[in-house]
Every structure is written in C-alpha cells, then in structure tokens.
C-alpha cells in the first residue's frame, strides 16, 4: 500500500485504490464499507471499501477475515497481503481523512459534523466503485448513528442496489470485515509514517493508543502543545480533550467576533423587539465595512 501521496501532503484527504478485477466488471458484486480511527484524538480517519463477485464470496470467507479490532497487527498484515494476492477477484479503495480536514470541517462557520462527514465519505467510495464500472448489486455497511436512518439515506442515493446497514457489520459480514482490515492497515501505516511539518523539539513517538481517555495520549498532548500555535496537525483539535488542554496550557485568543459580542453598542436580539417589558433604545454600531474605512454618517456637507 503506497501512502506516499499522503506523506507529501497530510493536510487534506487522500484516496487509494487497487486495480479493478476484470471479473468485477462482469459479474454481480457485493461491497462492504467500514472505517478505522473514528474515535482517536490523534491521526487520520480511514474509510475503506472491499468488493468481490458474489460467486467468489466463499473464497473471501475462506481467508478467515474478521473484524480488524479482534486481530493482531501481524494477522491484519497477513490477511491484507493475502487479499492483495487475490487481486484477480478482490478489489478495494479507501479515503484517508486527515486530522486537519476533520477538525476544520467540524469547527467551520458551517458545521460539518463527524457523522455527516462519515456518511458522505462512505457514499463517495460506493460511488467511486460504480464510476469504475464495478457491477455492485449489494452493499453492507457498518453503521454510524442510527442504522435505519443511514440505510434509508444510502438506499435513496443508490436505488438500484440492495443496501444493508447494521451495527457490528464488521463481525457479521466477511466483506465488511475485509474492508475493516484495509482501513486499519492503512491507518496504522499512516500513523507510523506521519510526516510532522512542524519543527517539534524532542518529539515523543510514544503517544499511547491515541484515544482521548488514554493517560499517555493526554501526556503527549500536554507535552506538544505550543502556547501560541497550538497542536501539530497530527492532532484533531476539535476534540474536547484537545480543546481542554488548549484552554489550560495555551494563550488566550480574542477573536473579532468575540469582541463584537461584548460590544454594548451591538444590535440587540431580534426577540427583544417583541418583548412586553420597557424597550431600551441602544445605539447601533455601524457596519464593519464603514468602520474599516473610517466612514461616518454626515448630516451636512
């Protein structure tokens, strides 16, 4: 698995895929979707699909694929290599979503929460397989959120495909188990080979599991937080654990919007115009356009 594209630029997203097996262009195929790294405060989240012909599903099961969380790293690597060898009937694709992309999506002016990002990434990978002319007839997905709602959404988006969304799908359906292995192997490689663009002093590679409740992970975050610039891009700064450390260890930042909220001359809430109490008339500050240009209203010229 070549992650060189991600290593060159780990600020956005990276898509990797195998060649499409010729048989998958002709025969009806089943496709599984799963992710790795949804919960950690460190490193990317990886979504993966795996697909194969329905007629070869028994061959995939014979590899004894299982939920990646139940396998050791060596077992995952062995199964990944075996599925790569079986490239004549097994195909895969994955999206690597950087911590920076996840955090800026969640904290942007227009919020894009993790569930929506996950749903759209999964749908994008299914669409990618279809765009590659893979003859997908069945899709199995490990759920994010309510499975019924998620399934209805995917079914509406892909009306010609039989979609099944289940909790713990990675332990129920071999094709989802295979996808979970691809996702986990890719994330482990991405984390292990992460290129820090920041000039960190005494970089500690022992950060524990990467999950927010891990004491080692918390200690790593406290050690590598900059009081002005915050965390390296390896950190999902939208996670509450990271935000709490920033508030305690970093310098306070006053944003222009924050100043405006504390300005006594800012306009009142719209609901104040409909309240029954005594109305207080407050002067309104001019629009930002006029303030920046030093323009004021004039009654005479």
Swiss-Prot record:
Residues where N-acetylmethionine is found: 1
Domain called RNase H type-2: residue spans: 28-251
Pfam families: RNase_HII
Top EC class for this record: hydrolase
SUPFAM superfamilies: Ribonuclease H-like (SSF53098)
E.C. code: 3.1.26.4
An MF annotation (GO) of this entry: RNA binding
Gene Ontology CC, one term: ribonuclease H2 complex
Cofactor: Mn(2+); Mg(2+)
PANTHER family (alphabetical): RIBONUCLEASE H2 SUBUNIT A (PTHR10954:SF7)
Name of this protein: Ribonuclease H2 subunit A
Provenance organism: Mus musculus (Mouse)
Lineage, broadest ranks: Eukaryota, Metazoa, Chordata, Craniata, Vertebrata
Gene this protein is translated from: Rnaseh2a
């Amino acid at each position: 698995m070549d992650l060189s594209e991600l290593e060159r630029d780990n600020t956005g997203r990276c898509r990797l895929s195998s060649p499409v097996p010729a048989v998958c262009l002709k025969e009806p195929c089943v496709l599984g979707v799963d992710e790795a790294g949804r919960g950690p405060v460190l490193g990317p989240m990886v979504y993966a699909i795996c697909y194969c012909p329905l007629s070869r599903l028994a061959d995939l099961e014979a590899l004894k694929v299982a939920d990646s969380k139940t396998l050791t790293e060596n077992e995952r690597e062995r199964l990944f290599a075996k599925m790569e060898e079986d490239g004549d009937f097994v195909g895969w694709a994955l999206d690597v979503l950087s911590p920076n992309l996840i955090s800026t999506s969640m904290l942007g002016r227009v919020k894009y929460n993790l569930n929506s990002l996950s749903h759209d990434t999964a749908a994008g990978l299914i669409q990618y397989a279809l765009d590659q002319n893979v003859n997908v007839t069945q899709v199995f997905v490990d759920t994010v959120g309510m499975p019924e709602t998620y399934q209805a959404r995917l079914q509406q988006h892909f009306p010609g495909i039989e979609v099944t969304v289940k909790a713990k799908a990675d332990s129920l359906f071999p094709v989802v188990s295979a996808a979970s292995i691809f996702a986990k192997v890719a994330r482990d490689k991405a984390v292990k080979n992460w290129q820090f663009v920041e000039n960190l002093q005494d970089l500690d590679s022992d950060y524990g599991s990467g999950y927010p409740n891990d004491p080692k992970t918390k200690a790593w975050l406290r050690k590598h937080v900059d009081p002005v610039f915050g965390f390296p891009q390896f950190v999902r700064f939208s996670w509450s654990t990271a935000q709490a450390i920033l508030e305690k260890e970093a310098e306070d930042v006053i944003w222009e919007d924050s100043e405006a909220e504390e300005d006594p001359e800012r306009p009142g809430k719209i609901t104040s115009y409909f309240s029954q109490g005594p109305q207080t008339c407050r002067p309104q500050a001019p629009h930002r356009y006029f303030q920046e240009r030093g323009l004021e209203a004039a009654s005479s010229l």
